[in-house]
């Protein structure tokens, strides 16, 4: 399956962050630029203002490493998932879509939590609970994970949704601290989840015991 460049010479390309799905920019590509993307694994476009091929990041160093690509139902629009190096927008912002017309919170809370824990590790803050846990070492972190898991179980038995949500939140936080302590990133967890869900035949079968 390929874009239909016979229908129109230039087709729009929507570029998204492959981790957060944040829309970074909209550009246009022609058949030559499209082939360049397939060959190099980086984004190439056609600059309508300069009337020439445009290798994203060639001048700024803000390259886009292609992680995935999809074609729409009419074969005339591309959706490209990338690892963004630096900022996508020439204004210096990460995304070109920063002028908010109608407020919408598209933040990835788990990515933000991971970043916050990493920042605490690199730049310790006095009386920070995160720094306290990281400083105490693996045994303390594991103890807290166990305690919070038990609290989730108790809250579940109490049939109190509000309490359960709070305990799940506490457990997730401590799991993120453990991940940081063990050098595991959120992206690695996401990739492992994808591998497991995409694995063919990965289905649990329930068997009943029959009398002999």
Curated annotation (Swiss-Prot):
GO CC terms in record: cytoplasm
UniProt EC number: 3.5.4.19, 3.6.1.31
One GO BP: L-histidine biosynthetic process
Record's keyword annotation contains Transcription regulation: no
Major location (coarse): cytoplasm
Region (Phosphoribosyl-ATP pyrophosphohydrolase): 110-212
Stretches for region Phosphoribosyl-AMP cyclohydrolase: 1-109
Example of a GO MF term: ATP binding
Protein localization: Cytoplasm
Catalytic activity entry: 1-(5-phospho-beta-D-ribosyl)-ATP + H2O = 1-(5-phospho-beta-D-ribosyl)-5'-AMP + diphosphate + H(+); 1-(5-phospho-beta-D-ribosyl)-5'-AMP + H2O = 1-(5-phospho-beta-D-ribosyl)-5-[(5-phospho-beta-D-ribosylamino)methylideneamino]imidazole-4-carboxamide
Keywords: Amino-acid biosynthesis, ATP-binding, Cytoplasm, Histidine biosynthesis, Hydrolase, Multifunctional enzyme, Nucleotide-binding
Transmembrane segments: none
Pathway(s) per entry: Amino-acid biosynthesis; L-histidine biosynthesis; L-histidine from 5-phospho-alpha-D-ribose 1-diphosphate: step 2/9; Amino-acid biosynthesis; L-histidine biosynthesis; L-histidine from 5-phospho-alpha-D-ribose 1-diphosphate: step 3/9
Stored HAMAP family: HisE, HisI, HisIE
Similarity-based family: In the N-terminal section; belongs to the PRA-CH family. In the C-terminal section; belongs to the PRA-PH family.
UniProt-recorded name of the protein: Histidine biosynthesis bifunctional protein HisIE
Gene field: hisI
């Amino acid at each position: 399956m390929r874009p239909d460049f016979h229908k129109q010479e230039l087709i729009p390309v929507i570029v998204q962050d492959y981790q957060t799905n944040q829309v970074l920019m909209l550009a246009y590509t022609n058949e030559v630029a499209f082939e360049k993307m397939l060959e190099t694994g980086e984004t190439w476009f056609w600059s309508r203002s300069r009337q020439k091929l445009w290798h994203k990041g060639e001048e700024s160093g803000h390259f886009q490493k292609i992680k995935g690509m999809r074609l729409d139902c009419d074969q005339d629009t591309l959706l490209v998932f990338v690892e963004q190096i630096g900022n996508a927008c020439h204004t210096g912002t990460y995304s070109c879509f920063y002028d908010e017309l109608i407020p919408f919170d598209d933040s990835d809370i788990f990515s933000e939590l991971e970043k916050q824990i990493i920042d605490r590790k690199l730049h310790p803050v006095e009386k920070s609970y995160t720094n306290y846990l990281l400083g105490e070492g693996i045994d303390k972190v594991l103890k807290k994970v166990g305690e919070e898991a038990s609290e989730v179980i108790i809250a579940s038995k109490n049939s109190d949704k509000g309490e359960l949500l709070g305990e799940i939140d506490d457990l997730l936080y401590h799991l993120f601290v453990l991940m940081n302590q063990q050098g595991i990133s959120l992206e690695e967890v996401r990739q492992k989840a994808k591998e497991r869900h995409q694995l063919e035949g990965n289905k649990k079968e329930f068997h009943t015991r029959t009398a002999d």
